[in-house]
């Protein structure tokens, strides 16, 4: 598909973020090497697709167990708000390079095999989660969340929301598990951009990866202290 202009690129990121922010990140990272003068625009567009992922996670959680929404938003909103502010700053800084001319080809992020893949991942994670919860407690859920988030964020989100709704795991555990899945997914995408993106994009996502690690580690420490004191 051919896309022209700043508006079209941003729209592509927003629409593409609905099924897969990972696909958007990969596509735009690859394009940034050819159109390096648009690195700020690509970064801004990628972060927008991540923001769509955030709203998707909130939406899925609300459908399954709305009682989790408050804690999940409390954990994730500051992170995505700061990312968006950073992206807007860079976008405005590099605005003079965002020419309307030229065209680029972007692969469609949708795939006919997505539904089958999602079902397979969900079933696998569901089986593993019961084993880990039984043998390793909440820590097993956290490990599973972090690892599964690399592959698919939707499956682990739906699963943890369902388990929390049934009372099999606590709301705090489910919310922290979803947080870990989101962060591992963002770290994976950041890593891809660092490896395959333009020089500027590499630097921008190095900051994102570092911020993600600091944010996640801080919340884990606070979460552990709160649980120890309760």
Curated annotation (Swiss-Prot):
Record-stated family: To P.aeruginosa PA0043 and M.thermoautotrophicum MTH1451.
GO CC, one annotated term: plasma membrane
Record membrane topology: Multi-pass membrane protein
Subcellular localization, as worded in the UniProt entry: Cell membrane
Regions that span the bilayer: 8-28, 45-65, 72-92, 109-129, 141-161, 176-196, 203-223
Pfam families: DUF4010
UniProt entry keywords in alphabetical sequence: Cell membrane, Membrane, Transmembrane, Transmembrane helix
Main location: membrane
Name of the protein in question: Uncharacterized protein aq_1828
């Amino acid at each position: 598909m051919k896309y022209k202009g700043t508006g079209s690129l941003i729209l592509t990121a927003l629409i593409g973020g609905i099924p897969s922010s990972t696909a958007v990140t990969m596509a735009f990272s690859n394009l940034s090497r050819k159109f390096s003068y648009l690195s700020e625009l690509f970064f801004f567009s990628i972060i927008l697709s991540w923001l769509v992922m955030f709203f998707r996670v909130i939406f899925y959680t609300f459908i399954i167990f709305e009682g989790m929404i408050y804690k999940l938003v409390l954990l994730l909103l500051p992170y995505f708000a700061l990312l968006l502010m950073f992206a807007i700053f860079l976008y405005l800084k590099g605005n003079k390079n965002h020419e309307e001319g030229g065209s680029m080809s972007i692969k469609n992020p949708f795939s006919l095999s997505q539904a089958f893949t999602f079902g397979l991942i969900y079933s696998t994670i569901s089986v593993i989660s019961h084993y880990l919860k039984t043998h390793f407690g909440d820590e097993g859920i956290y490990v599973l969340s972090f690892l599964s988030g690399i592959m698919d964020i939707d499956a682990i989100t739906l699963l943890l929301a369902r388990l929390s709704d049934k009372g099999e795991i606590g709301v705090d555990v489910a919310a922290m598990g979803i947080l870990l899945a989101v962060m591992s997914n963002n770290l994976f995408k950041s890593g891809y951009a660092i490896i395959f993106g333009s020089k500027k994009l590499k630097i921008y996502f190095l900051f994102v990866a570092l911020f993600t690690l600091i944010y996640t580690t801080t919340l884990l420490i606070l979460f552990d202290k709160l649980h120890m004191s309760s």
